[in-house]
């Protein structure tokens, strides 16, 4: 431990010790950021939070000791605890805490973007920025070395210049063109906010500490330029460049992992925010190979992930944004790799549903569209239409373009369908084709509500029939989502593992108690089956909420009734089931037509149907309460956060149905949640698990 110089008369008196400075300024904000970010931290984020502080500590320690040794800054003895070398122990903590603050802040700012959308090779006409950035850093390095002469006014400035230029040259070479490819909204603005947020905060804390004598900048080794009162330009530069280094490192990590995810062989789990084994040497070799890869290089076309072009991913996710604002908002809480996968999965489900259930088309046209969707699934899985070898040699996008060329669809629908179908191609290694066929059975059931042959019409007679239908259109989606999440986390579920489709309400809290007491071991097939089974139950639960909300609109607009016939009270409401199937609901806007048409006898009121919707909600709530604890078993914290928020927000629609006013009930309006209610429900689910 080295003794410190005695303070001169020019130093301000120390009224704030270094450790109290940490307690007042750095630790609280670090703690707050950690609490906010913790539910969303991926394995990639954790890698940043581990590696970047370590690298910063190793790189800064000798430089900082040299700075203090040459008296560029100094400390009062009684304001520090002790020194290691020439530097107070609190200063070493500062290296780590600042790295954590900046990395956490950058994570919160940039987590909303999808880096895999911006890996398109740069065109020759677009000059790369990396050589210019590296050349600038080299010049700063040379000038900094020349200026860093001890006991001169340029010393501190020069030391910062050469010390920061080396890591900046390396990191900007690996990230600056990637940031430019992301554009202004997704790249430069988040980059700037990520840098300026911590920088402005640390400038403020530095002024506070300097005014209270926590540390002192030597005027003999400073330029003595103060752009902000009491804050030397060297201190401003130090915090600015260190945050640029940290943010550049974060963007570089994102770029490297995005490349690794898209270029991994199909038989290996790709590196991603959800799968990043830091204990494996192969991880670092793959990251380095991605780092040195030129932005002008194309990704290998042999990989299923790389066969999906970024513009198709973008178009698919745009379909999701237009089709389901609720799911799109909830998906923002997922890590970007799972947001891509599950977003594309849901987008294809919506595209397929729109194709099959287009209200403007006749039944025969809808049936043909159902066959088109089935052919699309076959093409994605390379099983039919043409020889398998030809399938594998033809890009999936081209295959689908040929398939859709003869379909009687508009160009816009063809484009959206091809983009959505192309984007699910990487998921074929996790999702068995039979699950898509199961979903198509549900779509077929929707079509048969209006079948000309009465014997083939869809009629849900019992609760078992309703559960079977809900399994096809929602339970299967729950299983798909869990299969994708587990696969992306490195625990691929066998494609031949079939899940029990029978839904049974159990004794209160039985499932919650069993899951809480005995965590699932996802290396055991039986426990994987349990998780998939509960995912299906959750899907059925949410589908029942959807049915309860839309009883009247489904009847009036689609001539459908998803409430099972045996749910209706035979004595009180005989004929209500058939009335709903025929759309004979007395709504204010067209009730007079029904009366004057002499059909008043068979007309039902929304108030009369409501009790059956509430009964369905009771069943849905029990299923939800039993299956919700299973979400805690998902081996991915941010995936848990996103799915809990999505399920909680959707299930809360049931509460909104129960709280509808008499006017809303009689008018047959759908129950809707405000954006504020959605946000509050999501926060409660993510942070308080309720």
From Swiss-Prot:
Its EC number is 5.5.1.19, 2.5.1.32. It catalyses: all-trans-lycopene = gamma-carotene; gamma-carotene = all-trans-beta-carotene; 2 (2E,6E,10E)-geranylgeranyl diphosphate = 15-cis-phytoene + 2 diphosphate. It comes from the Eukaryota. The chain crosses the membrane at residues 21-41, 48-68, 92-114, 129-149, 156-176, 183-203, 231-251. The keyword Transferase applies. It is a multi-pass membrane protein. GO terms for molecular function: 15-cis-phytoene synthase activity; intramolecular lyase activity; lycopene beta cyclase activity. GO terms for cellular component: membrane. It is found in: Membrane. Residues 262-686 are annotated as: Phytoene synthase. Pathway: Carotenoid biosynthesis; beta-carotene biosynthesis; Carotenoid biosynthesis; phytoene biosynthesis; all-trans-phytoene from geranylgeranyl diphosphate: step 1/1. Residues 1-255 are annotated as: Lycopene beta-cyclase. The keyword DNA repair does not apply. Keywords: Carotenoid biosynthesis, Isomerase, Membrane, Multifunctional enzyme, Transferase, Transmembrane, Transmembrane helix. GO terms for biological process: carotenoid biosynthetic process. In the N-terminal section; belongs to the lycopene beta-cyclase family. Bifunctional enzyme that catalyzes the reactions from geranylgeranyl diphosphate to phytoene (phytoene synthase) and lycopene to beta-carotene via the intermediate gamma-carotene (lycopene cyclase). PANTHER family: BIFUNCTIONAL LYCOPENE CYCLASE/PHYTOENE SYNTHASE. This is Bifunctional lycopene cyclase/phytoene synthase. It comes from Mycosarcoma maydis.
